[in-house]
Every structure is written in structure tokens, then in C-alpha cells.
């Protein structure tokens, strides 16, 4: 155990977050997300939800302030309602990075973007459309 590090973050994920550089992306996937197909590196967090993992990760990971939207969600398919979890995701992003914009990518472009991500965190989240891409920023003055 380490001080100040959420016990939700397994050692493998902590290493990945440290290895990521400016502009690298990490995907938080829900239980339906094809993580093994998309990710070069997959960290399984099956018993945890996307929002709690997002909260733990954003406590450590700076978001990229040099892009318009360093956070992206998978857009709903036509006719599907807006998922209630989006409000929780937005509130969590706002808590850690006030004013951060969130982009919405259609499903197949989202999958394409996910394939080039540094890593994928597979959660046990059962809410639909609960997938989040985070672009890492920088620390410094």
C-alpha cells in the first residue's frame, strides 16, 4: 500500500499511468467493451464501476489542456436515450479538472481511437455507453 494512492488502482495500472506520456490515451471500458480486442495492454478491474475508477485515476492523471476535449465518451446509437451515467462521469471530470470539455465519438471511430490507446482498463460497469477515453496532460510550470 502507498499513501495517497487509491487502493482501487492495482499496481499494474499505477505503472501504466506513470509510463504514459503527454498525449497518450487510456480507455476505461464498461463490462461490454471489447477490451481484449482493442487494447495492447489490458488491466482488469471487474468488480469496479467506471465512475469509481475514473475518480481514482483522475486523482493522479493530469488531463491534456492543449486539446479542446481531453475526455471522450462513446456517442449513443440513434434512438438510444442519453445514459444517466454520463452525468456522473461529467461530475467526476468536473471535480478533478473544472471546465474540461467532453467530446462524443461515434461507436466505430471510438473503437478506432481505442485501438491506438496506451492501455484499456476493463471495469465491471453494467451501465450502457459507460466508456471513457482520457488524454494525459503534463505536470510542470
Q: PLM ranges: what are they?
A:
Residues 53, 57-82, 89-93:
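Aromatic-anchored, charged helix-turn/loop surface patch used as a conserved interaction hotspot
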Residues 5, 29-31, 36-38, 45-46, ...:
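Fold-independent oxyanion-binding glycine-rich loops
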Residues 11-12, 42-58:
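Gly/Ser/Thr-rich active-site loops/lids in small-molecule metabolic enzymes
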Residues 1-44:
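Long, hydrophobic N-terminal alpha-helical segment
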Residues 9, 18-20, 34-35, 66, ...:
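Solvent-exposed alpha-helices and their adjacent loops that cap or buttress functional pockets
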Residues 3, 24-27, 41-43, 64-73, ...:
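Structural motif
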Residues 80-141:
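Glycine-rich, aromatic-bearing surface loops/beta-hairpins
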Amino acid at each position: 500500500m502507498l499513501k495517497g494512492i487509491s487502493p482501487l488502482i492495482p499496481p499494474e495500472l499505477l505503472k501504466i499511468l506513470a509510463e504514459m506520456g503527454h498525449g497518450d490515451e487510456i480507455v476505461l471500458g464498461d463490462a461490454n467493451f471489447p477490451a481484449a480486442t482493442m487494447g495492447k495492454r489490458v488491466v482488469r478491474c471487474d468488480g469496479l464501476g467506471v465512475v469509481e475508477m475514473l475518480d481514482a485515476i483522475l486523482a493522479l492523471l493530469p488531463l491534456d489542456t492543449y486539446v479542446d476535449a481531453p475526455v471522450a465518451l462513446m456517442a449513443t446509437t440513434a434512438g438510444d436515450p442519453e445514459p444517466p451515467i454520463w452525468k456522473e462521469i461529467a461530475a467526476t471530470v468536473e471535480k478533478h479538472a473544472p471546465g474540461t470539455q467532453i467530446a462524443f465519438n461515434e461507436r466505430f471511430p471510438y473503437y478506432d481511437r481505442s485501438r491506438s490507446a496506451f492501455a484499456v482498463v476493463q471495469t465491471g460497469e453494467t451501465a450502457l455507453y459507460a466508456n471513457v477515453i482520457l488524454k494525459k496532460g503534463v505536470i510542470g510550470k
